[in-house]
Amino acid sequence: MAISAAQVKELRERTGAGMMDCKKALEETNGDMELAIDNMRKSGAAKAAKKAGNIAADGTILIKNGEGFAVLLEVNCQTDFVAKDANFLGFANAVLDVAAASKVTLEDLKAQFEEARVALVAKIGENINVRRVEYIDGAKLASYRHGERIGVVVTGDADEETLKHLAMHVAASKPEYVNPEDVPADVVAREQALQIEISMNEGKPADIAEKMVVGRMKKFTGEISLTGQAYIMEPKKTVGEFLKEKGAKVTNFIRLEVGEGIEKKEEDFAAEVAAQIAASKKA
């Protein structure tokens, strides 16, 4: 059966697949449009399953502010090229809209968009993963995106400009906690044990070593907390000192960066080429 251009066009519009893939699918089903769509969906699911093992450590961070809250979303792909693709970004924004509208869990988002994800994997040829969604509440909040890769939302009792600048600071300085006293006891204990061992190995007298550890611990908790860090806008002040002068306060923040915590595969191209040359000599 001859396949018409109109049939190919219709299938392409309904599936988003390439023209040649649509023509092939229609030829295999003798022009049965619905069967072609079913077969393409099955093929897409198979491709997605094969791609599932590929490391998706690139992607985008998106933010949307709601009434008294904000949502941050990370969607991953494998390359920065696809991270800029309109189809990928359209999918990510669709997920973001649903998250912002209903504050659903990550598991529910994944389930709701699985069919669309599978279709996108089949279309672009890369693994796609809806990795993280975070919600943060606050009557006053400000958000900041650094490119497509870092997203921050800060909440607190301050004007919008101040919160915006603090969000930029969080993006650059990567604090883990709001205040030094917020650092968990187990984190403090682990660092303290390490500093005691370092001081002992340095051969310092016990009283001096004790003072050194106290100073180092103060520095440690300050460096990983927002209010203890030097403020990037006014480096001679800590963020805490700046907030005190402004009569302002930060209550919470969330910072997401694309791919953080994902173990990336390191490609050794020299070794790969050498192996290919060796294999060709044996052939």
Swiss-Prot record:
<dbReference type="InterPro" id="IPR036402">
    <property type="entry name" value="EF-Ts_dimer_sf"/>
</dbReference>
<feature type="region of interest" description="Involved in Mg(2+) ion dislocation from EF-Tu">
    <location>
        <begin position="79"/>
        <end position="82"/>
    </location>
</feature>
<dbReference type="InterPro" id="IPR009060">
    <property type="entry name" value="UBA-like_sf"/>
</dbReference>
<keyword id="KW-0963">Cytoplasm</keyword>
<dbReference type="GO" id="GO:0006414">
    <property type="term" value="P:translational elongation"/>
</dbReference>
<dbReference type="InterPro" id="IPR001816">
    <property type="entry name" value="Transl_elong_EFTs/EF1B"/>
</dbReference>
<dbReference type="GO" id="GO:0003746">
    <property type="term" value="F:translation elongation factor activity"/>
</dbReference>
<comment type="similarity">
    <text>Belongs to the EF-Ts family.</text>
</comment>
<comment type="function">
    <text>Associates with the EF-Tu.GDP complex and induces the exchange of GDP to GTP. It remains bound to the aminoacyl-tRNA.EF-Tu.GTP complex up to the GTP hydrolysis stage on the ribosome.</text>
</comment>
<protein>
    <recommendedName>
        <fullName>Elongation factor Ts</fullName>
    </recommendedName>
</protein>
<dbReference type="Pfam" id="PF00889">
    <property type="entry name" value="EF_TS"/>
</dbReference>
<dbReference type="InterPro" id="IPR018101">
    <property type="entry name" value="Transl_elong_Ts_CS"/>
</dbReference>
<keyword id="KW-0648">Protein biosynthesis</keyword>
<dbReference type="InterPro" id="IPR014039">
    <property type="entry name" value="Transl_elong_EFTs/EF1B_dimer"/>
</dbReference>
<keyword id="KW-0251">Elongation factor</keyword>
<dbReference type="GO" id="GO:0005737">
    <property type="term" value="C:cytoplasm"/>
</dbReference>
